[in-house]
């Protein structure tokens, strides 16, 4: 995928709590991307209508999901972006239902053999993907299953894995006091936007 002069970085917010820790860190990451000269956009999944995958396999044939909801527009935004940064809290040792429904719907990009649909491959090849996780547990590795899911997706599909920022914050907004976490998120955004 040829890089534009101004990179486009898409932020995907997977928490239902706008203004919460995941949202604050995603804003930091997008500020870092913007500081590096990128055009940025944020999508809040909880404000979108996204149904779960029905495993009907129609997208394996056409590359287009038959479910007519907001994910169709998000697919277009993913294709247009040079990098995607996801931010999600840990809910019951995994990602939120909003993020899971979104990630499952990525199957529209693939054929039945889990290879890129040929018309998507040129637009997805080398696309950068990063992750921010926030958990209430002091042990940030509580988020390991989420990191594994996103990193494995990147490896399987030959996306460029930017890495994960893993943090801990128990109450809404607590992360604002964590200068290290904010800097790590900012730096992830800069990395996403640097050619």
Region locations from a protein language model:
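Short, Lys/Arg-enriched N-terminal segments with co-localized hydrophobic residues
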Residues: 1-6
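Glycine-rich phosphate/pyrophosphate-binding loop and the adjoining helix
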Residues: 7, 35-36, 141, 147-195
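N-terminal beta1-alpha1 ligand-phosphate binding loop
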Residues: 7-38
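Residue-level recognition of beta-strand->loop/alpha-helix junctions
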Residues: 13, 44, 165-166
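A short beta-strand-loop structural module common to alpha/beta enzyme folds
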Residues: 38-48
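Cysteine-cluster motifs in flexible loop/terminal segments that predominantly coordinate metals
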Residues: 49-75
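Short, hinge-like loop/turn segments at secondary-structure boundaries
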Residues: 57-61, 104, 180-182
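Helix-loop-strand module that forms the ligand-binding subsite of alpha/beta enzymes
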Residues: 66-155
């Amino acid at each position: 995928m040829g890089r534009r002069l101004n990179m486009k970085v898409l932020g995907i917010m997977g928490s239902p709590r706008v203004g919460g820790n995941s949202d604050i860190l995603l804003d930091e990451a997008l500020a870092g991307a913007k500081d590096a000269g990128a055009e940025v956009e944020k999508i809040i999944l909880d404000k979108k209508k996204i149904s779960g995958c029905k495993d009907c396999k129609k997208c394996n044939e056409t590359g287009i999901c038959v479910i007519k909801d907001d994910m169709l527009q998000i697919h277009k935004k993913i294709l247009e972006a040079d990098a995607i940064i996801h931010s999600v809290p840990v809910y019951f040792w995994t990602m939120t239902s909003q993020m899971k429904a979104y990630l499952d719907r990525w199957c529209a990009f693939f054929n039945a053999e889990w290879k890129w649909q040929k018309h998507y491959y040129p637009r997805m090849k080398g696309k950068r993907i990063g992750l921010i996780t926030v958990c209430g547990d002091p042990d940030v590795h509580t988020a390991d299953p989420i990191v594994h899911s996103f990193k494995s997706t990147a490896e399987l599909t030959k996306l460029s894995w930017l890495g994960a920022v893993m943090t801990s914050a128990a109450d809404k907004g607590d992360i604002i006091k964590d200068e290290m976490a904010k800097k790590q998120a900012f730096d992830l955004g800069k990395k996403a936007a640097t050619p």
